[in-house]
A protein has these predicted regions:
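Short alpha-helical oligomerization interface
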Residues: 24-28
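Canonical Radical SAM [4Fe-4S] cluster-binding loop centered on the CxxxCxxC motif
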Residues: 21
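The conserved acidic donor/metal-binding loop of glycosyltransferases
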Residues: 106-109
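Conserved core of the sugar-phosphate nucleotidyltransferase
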Residues: 111-173
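A generic secondary-structure signal marking the coil-to-beta-strand transition
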Residues: 6-7, 29, 100, 136, ...
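Terminal amphipathic alpha-helical/low-complexity segments used for targeting or macromolecular assembly
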Residues: 1-6, 15, 44, 123, ...
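Conserved N-terminal catalytic core of the sugar/cofactor nucleotidyltransferase
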Residues: 1-10, 18, 32, 36-103
Length: 173
């Protein structure tokens, strides 16, 4: 069964400490790559796929995102706990918007548009890392479903990019 995507939530609350010193003046989502602001490129790609309801979770330097409301008609939601909590807090603040939803990282640059209006099932994007990594690693059962998440691991798949959550999956939050 294919799910019609209802909306997208873009996570943009973090301080981007790994982007320092670039992130001292602006959030990483607002950094330009190849002449385009990262988050604006992602918004345009979502629009091109027919996804017009976009919620952006902000925190660090949140006022710098205000222009996106008028320019693109997005909704901003504040993660008041961005300094002490991770993306789980951002999802908590956005829980009322979870439906058939893309959950995206604001700092991804996609050359080719990865978004589609219809998606077959909930998924996470992952990359395999040989050796040790400090990323969020996933474990899988025999059918390929995620059954564990750990911070750090060896010879592991780790989460990257965007995810899709069906309404059924989202309701568990």
């Amino acid at each position: 069964m294919a799910y019609k995507v209802d909306n997208a939530i873009i996570m943009a609350a973090g301080t981007a400490s790994r982007f320092a010193p670039l992130s001292f003046e602006k959030p990483k989502a607002l950094i330009e790559v190849r002449g385009e602001v990262l988050i604006e490129r992602q918004i345009k790609q979502l629009f091109a796929a027919g996804i017009n309801e976009i919620v952006i979770i902000v925190g660090y330097k949140k006022e710098q995102f205000d222009y996106l409301i008028d320019k693109y008609g997005v909704k901003l939601v504040e993660n008041k706990d961005y300094l002490t909590r991770n993306n789980n807090a951002s999802i908590y603040y956005a829980k009322q918007y979870l439906k058939n939803t893309y959950v995206c990282s604001s700092d991804n640059y996609f050359v080719k548009n990865p978004f589609e209006k219809y998606v077959d099932e909930s998924y996470y994007s992952a990359v395999y890392a040989e050796g040790h990594t400090e990323e969020w690693c996933i474990g899988q059962d025999a059918e390929g479903y995620i059954n564990a998440v750990t911070i750090g691991g060896n010879d592991s798949w780790y989460m990257v990019g965007h995810t899709f959550w069906s309404k059924e999956f989202s309701s568990k939050f």
